[in-house]
């Protein structure tokens, strides 16, 4: 993924205990799958993007890995992909502004972890990515740059109407 230390740690962790949900950008999950990846620091490389041309190949690859690892994968990017051994979903919510600030991957990871407490990994990942993407779209409309966008993203996620949440009471 982004460093040999991080990659080796992830590989070792996967031998000790496989998480129910493994989230990463395309470069990270390609690397974890033993494929060539083109990461730039912690970001996915421009060559590691989900496209119409590679969609079916990547879906097959990641479904095989999800089955091998007995987990669900959330591959983030301009278009997110959630893959389990028997299901696949694509999420197109979000905005390029989300890649211009630090921490969106961590935020999404925490949302996924929260949702895992109340549902299965596939539903948790699809719901988290969709809702976080919607919050990003709303935040972009109300911000003037990356600083205000970051604050607005938190506010928009916090203020999503209860009926927009899958897990509302």
Where are these regions (language model features)?
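Short, small-residue-enriched loops and turns at beta-alpha junctions
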Residues: 1-4, 81, 98
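Electropositive phosphate-/nucleotide-binding environments in soluble metabolic enzymes
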Residues: 4-7, 56-59, 106, 122, ...
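Conserved phosphate/ATP/ADP-binding segment of small-molecule kinases
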Residues: 9-88
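Short, well-structured alpha-helical segments that form the helix of a local strand-helix-strand
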Residues: 61-66, 121-136, 153-154
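Short, contiguous, well-ordered secondary-structure segments
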Residues: 83-85, 89-91, 111, 115-116
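Short pre-catalytic strand/loop immediately N-terminal to key active-site residues, enriched for Gly-Thr
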Residues: 91-102
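Charged C-terminal helix
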Residues: 134-169
């Amino acid at each position: 993924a982004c460093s040999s230390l991080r990659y080796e740690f992830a590989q070792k962790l996967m031998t000790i205990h496989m998480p129910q949900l493994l989230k990463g950008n395309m470069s990270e999950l390609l690397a974890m799958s033993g494929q060539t990846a083109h990461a730039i620091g912690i970001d996915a490389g421009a060559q590691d993007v989900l496209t119409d041309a590679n969609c079916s190949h990547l879906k097959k690859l990641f479904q095989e890995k999800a089955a091998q690892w007995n987990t669900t994968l959330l591959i983030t990017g301009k278009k997110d992909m959630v893959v389990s051994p028997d299901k696949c979903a694509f999420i197109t919510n979000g905005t390029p502004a989300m890649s211009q600030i630090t921490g969106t991957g961590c935020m999404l990871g925490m949302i996924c972890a929260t949702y895992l407490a109340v549902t299965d990994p596939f539903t948790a990942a699809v719901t988290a990515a969709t809702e976080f993407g919607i919050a990003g779209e709303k935040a972009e409309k109300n911000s003037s740059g990356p600083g205000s966008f970051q604050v607005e993203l938190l506010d928009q996620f916090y203020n999503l109407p209860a009926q927009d949440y899958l897990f509302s009471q």
